């Protein structure tokens, strides 16, 4: 090669110029500039210098390098990937690299004594350890498991090979150079491969037979595995050149076999024992399939442990088409389950509720309890005054005014016994409790003003009490007034079938005055006497059961529910289920505001700790655990949601038509509230007179006073219009009406109510239609059009012919076709209408049999407005 500059030489070698200059200076050559020329002699000196430094690096390298690696994996052993057992596999690999100069020293080391292999019983989880001792020589293989020969040494004798292998094991215990640099290892591999010449004869002779056998065995295994005849007995993680050794976790493996020998009988037995397989069941598996009222095809297939496609096939064979997400009924599910050979078990809708009743612990100890009294009556008849007087006079000393005003129930102790009063202004709570079947009230006190007599709400209270089959005690209030007339009250109540005992009936009448306190003690005595007749008793030692009187959301304490315990004892810390809500009782507050630890029958308490606010009238019960409470609460919420969605249609005057069907008699329900009784009767009579044979007006509820929550509930349940005459709805009723999308109509003039209801009834009448002929055209000639078909050339002889109107084709005054006028042209121009005396071309939609002389009659359908 010709002389080159330092820069050109650096480009040829592929290193930076600065590095080449440093190497030239280290070699003893004086080069300082990249433009200096380098001759052949200087290149040779540089090359010898670089080779010398490389040899020094190699001689300074360690004589032995051992590399260890460990990897973890999992293997599924069994018939398939789903039913097999997963075992953990640990693969240990070791590679030892030895310099040539170290071999003679290792040959002098004696061979260590190898302890015998101890076989241990199999465990569920095994660890696979592959100790790999590899050199440049090829590896020896056997038929089943690869076993690697020791490292080949420079000497050509087998003894020296074994000594070298022993020395490797000894060096392994010393853990020399475990974390060697990977680049150095690769360089040393190249050096060792060049430095260790191995005789071809000795390299090939011991491996020809075993390697050939192994290849034949491997080929046969692969062919059988591809054909599906044979499963692989183990997973291979490395090449066949590596030694693999199976170990049990915590002990030696029973799979380890001696080198150069065949598998022993014990090894074969152990392998057969550990071979996982799947045995087909000898008899079909019959399952009990739980079937609710509705279930999807996918869920039904899952419960039978089959694929959804199988269920769909069975349903198709039975003549029913279904998709995987389709909901099928209980009867269809039973037929499908029986067809597939399983046993159906029908689940009832209230199975969760039934299970709740079974889970509640029943008590055995019964004791007498205090009566629960509800005071009802008409507005301004003294109900609140009576409650205030009893509260003021019967509260224990030092607790005057200590009754919590929000609780809605309180307990009164008298010398003759205890009484629990429910403060239920109006009838909303009582109605809700009776509707939910919660018979919380034992006695009803009916308050009637002696100077006012029986009023509509008084009659309503009597109806509620009779429907609940609760005894009534009549308290004639305001006896201190000069115009008090108790005889008039008794006469009016006898009309409602409330007969006093003095007249031979079974109802006690007590004359009282809530203002002066006259007759209050007699009223309490009558209550206790009536309770003795009823023989009220309750279980005291079982799980508590009661009813929610009212509930509210307290800003500082969260949901607070007033619960009247009916049986059992409610303790602090119990799991309470109340309607849709549940929770652990965090605190119990009595009616006078004190914290208590428990509450027995007929005792009202405030409960803190529920998840949300329950409804008034909900049943409250103590359940054994929170899981059961959550299950029942979620079930009730789902059922309530379904019912709510089922009646999702709104109640408005505009939507009445949507709720009516042609086959049903059309009735307009009205809930009416007015300010005075006279106006109420006048409006009711005027609306009732609007009824005809086709539509009727039915006032399902009417009363004097403001619109309450119970009125809104009644309007929702009966699909009625809520009308208020000179009255307004309270806050609770407004919120409920907005929540349920019920419109409340306010009026101040009676005639406005009559006109509005008359318009609603008019809209409910069945519509009537009339056909009016607007024009007649006579066909003079027929033309053919490639786009439309037959075109009738006509003369309008009467009226106006309009496009897109319905038409009739008459031939000899007989209707032969009825359709729509599709095309209307005059002098090739599309027109909307053609009047009498003009010619036009008419195209009839989907009809081509038009002939000269036919008449085309154009008409319109007009709806006739109906009035009452």
From Swiss-Prot:
Residues 402-406 are annotated as: G2. It comes from the Bacteria. One of its GO terms (cellular component) is cytosol. GTP binds at residues 377-384, 423-427, 477-480. Residues 377-384 are annotated as: G1. It holds the Pfam family IF2_assoc. InterPro entries: DNA-bd_dom_put_sf, EF-G-like_DII, EFTu-like_2, IF2_assoc_dom_bac, IF2_II, IF2_N, P-loop_NTPase, Small_GTP-bd. Gene3D superfamilies: P-loop containing nucleotide triphosphate hydrolases (3.40.50.300), Putative DNA-binding domain, N-terminal subdomain of bacterial translation initiation factor IF2 (3.30.56.50), Translation factors (2.40.30.10), Translation initiation factor IF- 2, domain 3 (3.40.50.10050). Keywords: Cytoplasm, GTP-binding, Initiation factor, Nucleotide-binding, Protein biosynthesis. Residues 423-426 are annotated as: G3. Residues 249-260 have a biased composition (Basic residues). PROSITE patterns: G_TR_2, IF2. The keyword Cytoplasm applies. GO terms for molecular function: GTP binding; GTPase activity; guanosine tetraphosphate binding; translation initiation factor activity. It is found in: Cytoplasm. Residues 513-515 are annotated as: G5. Residues 477-480 are annotated as: G4. Belongs to the TRAFAC class translation factor GTPase superfamily. Classic translation factor GTPase family. IF-2 subfamily. This is Translation initiation factor IF-2. It comes from Legionella pneumophila (strain Lens). The lineage of its organism: Bacteria, Pseudomonadati, Pseudomonadota, Gammaproteobacteria, Legionellales.
């Amino acid at each position: 090669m010709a002389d080159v500059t330092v820069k050109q030489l650096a480009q040829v070698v592929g290193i930076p110029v600065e590095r080449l200059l440093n190497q030239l200076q280290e070699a003893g050559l004086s080069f300082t500039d990249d433009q200096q020329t380098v001759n052949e002699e200087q290149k040779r000196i540089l090359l010898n210098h670089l080779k010398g430094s490389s040899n020094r690096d190699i001689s300074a390298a360690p004589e032995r390098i051992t590399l260890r690696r460990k990897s973890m994996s999992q293997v599924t052993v069994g018939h398939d990937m789903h039913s097999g057992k997963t075992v953990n596999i640990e693969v240990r690999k070791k590679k030892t690299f030895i310099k040539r100069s170290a071999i003679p020293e290792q040959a002098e080391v004696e061979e260590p004594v190898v302890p015998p292999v101890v076989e241990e019983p199999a465990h569920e989880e095994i660890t696979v350890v592959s100790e790999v001792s590899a050199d440049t020589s090829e590896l020896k293989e056997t038929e089943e498991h690869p076993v690697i020969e020791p490292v080949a040494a420079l000497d050509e004798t087998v003894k020296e090979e074994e000594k070298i292998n022993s020395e490797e094991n000894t060096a392994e215990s010393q853990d020399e150079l475990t974390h060697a640099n990977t680049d150095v290892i690769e360089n040393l591999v190249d050096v060792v491969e060049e430095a260790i010449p191995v005789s071809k004869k000795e390299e090939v002779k011991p491996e020809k037979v075993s390697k050939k056998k192994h290849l034949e065995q491997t080929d046969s295994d692969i062919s059988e595995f591809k054909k599906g005849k044979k499963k692989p007995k183990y997973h291979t993680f490395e090449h066949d050149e590596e030694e693999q050794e199976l170990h049990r976790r915590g002990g030696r493996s029973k799979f380890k076999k001696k080198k150069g020998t065949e598998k022993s009988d014990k090894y074969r037995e152990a392998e057969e024992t550990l071979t996982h397989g799947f045995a087909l069941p000898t008899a079909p598996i019959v399952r009990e399939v739980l079937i609710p009222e509705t279930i999807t095809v996918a869920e039904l297939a899952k419960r039978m442990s089959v694929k959804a496609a199988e269920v769909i096939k069975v349903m198709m064979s039975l003549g029913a088409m279904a998709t995987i997400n389709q909901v099928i009924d209980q009867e269809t599910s039973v037929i499908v389950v029986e067809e597939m050979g399983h046993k159906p078990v029908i689940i009832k809708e209230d199975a969760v509720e039934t299970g709740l009743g079974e889970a509640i612990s029943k008590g055995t100890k019964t004791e007498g309890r205090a009566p629960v009294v509800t005071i009802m009556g008409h507005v301004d008849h003294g109900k609140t005054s009576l409650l205030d007087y009893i509260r003021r006079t019967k509260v224990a000393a030092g607790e005057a005014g200590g009754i919590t005003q929000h609780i809605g129930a309180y307990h009164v102790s008298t010398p003759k016994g205890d009484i629990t009063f429910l403060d239920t202004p109006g009838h909303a709570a009582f109605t809700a409790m009776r509707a939910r079947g919660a018979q919380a009230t034992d006695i009803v006190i009916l308050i009637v003003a002696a100077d006012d007599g029986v009023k509509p709400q008084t009659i309503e209270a009597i109806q509620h009490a009779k429907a609940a089959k609760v005894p009534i005690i009549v308290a004639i209030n305001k006896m201190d007034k000069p115009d008090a007339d108790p005889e008039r009250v008794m006469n009016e109540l006898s009309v409602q079938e409330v007969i006093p005992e003095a007249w031979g009936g079974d109802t006690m009448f007590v004359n009282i005055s809530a203002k002066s306190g006259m007759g209050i003690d007699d009223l309490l005595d009558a209550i206790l006497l009536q309770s003795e007749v009823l023989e009220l008793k309750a279980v005291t030692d079982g799980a508590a059961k009661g009813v929610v009187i009212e509930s509210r959301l307290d800003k500082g304490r969260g949901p607070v529910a007033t619960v009247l315990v009916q049986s059992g004892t409610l303790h602090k810390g119990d799991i309470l289920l109340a309607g849709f809500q549940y929770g652990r009782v965090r605190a119990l507050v009595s009616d006078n505001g004190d914290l208590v630890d428990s509450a027995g029958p007929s005792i009202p308490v405030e409960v803190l700790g529920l998840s949300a606010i329950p409804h008034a009238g909900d049943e409250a019960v103590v359940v054994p655990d929170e899981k059961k409470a959550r299950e029942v609460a979620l079930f009730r919420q789902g059922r309530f949601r379904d019912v709510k969605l089922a009646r999702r249609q709104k109640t408005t005057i505009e939507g009445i038509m949507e709720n009516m069907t042609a086959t049903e008699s059309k009735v307009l329900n009205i809930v009416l509230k007015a300010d005075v009784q006279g106006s109420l009767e006048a409006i009711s009579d005027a609306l009732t007179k609007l009824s005809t044979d086709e539509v009727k007006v039915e006032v399902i509820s009417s009363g004097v006073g403001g619109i309450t929550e119970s009125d809104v509930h009644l309007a929702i349940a009966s699909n009625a219009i809520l009308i208020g005459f000179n009255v307004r709805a309270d806050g609770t009723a407004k919120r409920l009406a907005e929540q349920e999308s019920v419109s409340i109509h306010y009026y101040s003039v009676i005639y406005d109510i009559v006109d509005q209801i008359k318009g609603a009834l008019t809209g409910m009448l069945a519509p009537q239609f009339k056909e009016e002929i607007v024009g007649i055209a006579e066909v003079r000639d027929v033309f053919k059009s490639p786009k439309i078909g037959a075109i009738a050339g006509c003369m309008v002889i009467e009226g106006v012919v309009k496009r897109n109107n319905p038409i009739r084709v008459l031939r000899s005054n007989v209707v032969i076709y009825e359709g729509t006028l599709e095309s209307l042209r005059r002098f090739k121009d599309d027109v909307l209408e053609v009047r009498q005396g003009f010619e036009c071309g008419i195209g009839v939609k989907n009809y081509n049999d038009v002939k000269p002389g036919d008449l085309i009659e154009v008409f319109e359908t007009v709806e006739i407005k109906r009035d009452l």
